[in-house]
Amino acid sequence: MASRSRRPEHSGPPELFYDQNEARKYVRNSRMIDIQTKMTERALELLCLPEGQPSYLLDIGCGSGLSGDYISEEGHYWVGIDISPAMLDAALDRDTEGDLLLGDMGQGVPFRPGSFDGCISISAVQWLCNANKKSDVPARRLYCFFSSLYSALVRGARAVLQLYPENSEQLELITTQATRAGFTGGVVVDFPNSAKAKKFYLCLFSGPSTSLPKGLTESQDADQASESMFTSERAPHKKARRDLVKKSREWVLEKKERRRRQGKEVRPDTQYTGRKRKPRF
């Protein structure tokens, strides 16, 4: 978990770092858009939302609405909160479908109890570990965030927070405050042996503790194992998935693989997978 030489959190408060120039990158830079979309896709997988029905989700640190676009594509509704006016302006210019709120997650999420079916956050939570003024106490701000988030979720819902911890001490600080607020769960690490593609997802449960999903490895998903491949390959993949004949062998295999990525128990594939049963008399 080696820290980079120059982390954005060390440059100052997020509302100043994410100015108009930075917001422009999140709208025009195809590389950043691709990475953000893939991490959002993975976060939704880990949420394990009910299939075939829309959910109401909260996006913490929504920025220019890139994650929200994917949420909308999947048929869900969302509300986004961000501390940067420039990023929210970029989201408005892009006509994102979700509702947007300017706010500091370190002061809590201002929603009624049980408002959301789930929560995602991409590359935001680690900002709470830095004190930009004397009154900022990271542990206190983290607890305020997690306790208010716990309240805003329906009982049994999940929150999946992708983050870039600077070191193991910072990750422990975050998980400790989440547990103190009432959450169960843990950290899922995708591609742990890859320096570039390694990703941390804090998977939190607001109900009884369940088995933690397993992290992806290079052998499971080679396309996601490298951040150097930034093309439009994902779009035809989604189209191909929609074109699969329902109940066909390919459709069944794709559905089973998706459930494995969500951490669910799935029976092994065999030569009989996807075969129709013969009628019995």
UniProtKB/Swiss-Prot annotation:
It is found in: Nucleus; Nucleus, Nucleoplasm; Cytoplasm, Perinuclear region; Cytoplasm. Coiled coil: none annotated. The keyword Methyltransferase applies. Residues 242-256 have a biased composition (Basic and acidic residues). Keywords: Chromatin regulator, Cytoplasm, Methyltransferase, Nucleus, Ribosome biogenesis, rRNA processing, S-adenosyl-L-methionine, Transcription, Transcription regulation, Transferase, Ubl conjugation. Belongs to the class I-like SAM-binding methyltransferase superfamily. BUD23/WBSCR22 family. Heterodimer with TRMT112; this heterodimerization is necessary for the metabolic stability and activity of the catalytic subunit BUD23. Interacts with GRIP1. This is 18S rRNA (guanine-N(7))-methyltransferase. It comes from Mus musculus. The gene is Bud23.
